Structures are given as C-alpha cells and as structure tokens.
Amino acid sequence: VFAQTLHAAQDYAAKKGAIFIPPYDNLDVVLGQGTVGLEILDQLDDVQNIIVAIGGGGLAAGVAVAAKLKAKANGRKVKIYGVQSEHAAPYVTSLKKGKLTEVAITPTIADGIAVSKPGRVPFELIKKNIDKVVTVSENEIAKAILVLLERAKQVVEPAGAVGVAALIAGKLKLKGKTVVILSGGNMDPL
C-alpha cells in the first residue's frame, strides 16, 4: 500500500508540476523529524532508552542522530531501538548485509511502516546511530494497540504501536527510563 501511495504522489507531482517532498529519504525531512528526539531529551533529561518505529527510516534516523548528539553534548548516553513489523523488515535485512536491500513484504496491519527498501539517507544514519532493530508479529502489534487503548486511553495506529509491542513481547529487555514514541492515530474501523 505504501509503495503504491508513494508512486501515486510522485506521478501526481510530475503531472501537475508540483513539488514532491519525500516522506523519509531526504536529509531535511530527517533533520526535521529529529526534533522529536530533542524534545524528549529536553523534557526528560535522564532518559536512557528511546524506542521508535521504523518504516522508511526518516523518523528513526532523525530521532537517533538528534538524541545521541544532545545526550553526548550533556555528557550522557542514550540508546535508540528501532522496531519493524516482521512482515516488512527491510532494515533488519539491510543492516545484517551492510547495504540497502529490498525485501518482499506481506500484508501487515502496520501498513504505515510497510516499506520494502530503506531510504538511502536514513539507512546511513540508522546504521551508525541505532543500537538495535527488532521485529514484532501481527498478534504482538494487535495486543499493544489494545493495551494502549485500555490502559492509556490512547488510539494509536498499528505502525505507531510497534514499540509498545516490542516491550510487551519481551523483544527488548531494557533498564532505566525508557520512552516509546507513539506516532499516528490512523485506524481503520473494524
């Protein structure tokens, strides 16, 4: 779904003479998304871990670079963890191979992060700044959405709930103050 939407937007921009702004494979976009990492450290100066969903990689790359630079400037360290759906995990494969790798994706409820190939710009930044990337299953994502709704009264789309899914499923065993970035509230009705 994401690839189709991306191509449709590029085609539309070309036909209409509009400006196409890439959603993640653009340094300016990545830097803009990095402000999320800065805000986290501004508000929680003792945070030790940040968990972020990874699709194309823009948000994760921006958060990782900005948070690590700010923490270092303050004489601290912060670890950044990325999470992908096991149905669309190009970063896991690409990081293992050390190069951009396109993977086959299968349908996932986390369609907002269902990309088949990492962005070139974010991949280089993630390779250097993300401490670990894990995957979560469809059932783990669904459980996280339910937990967020029942306990936190938050409607979070599947793509944004993967970080909580990783924690609940025990994919990340972290010590210290941890922040999970919850992004997106786009939920299709049941």
Report each predicted region and the residues it spans.
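PLP-dependent amino-acid enzyme catalytic core
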Residues: 1-190
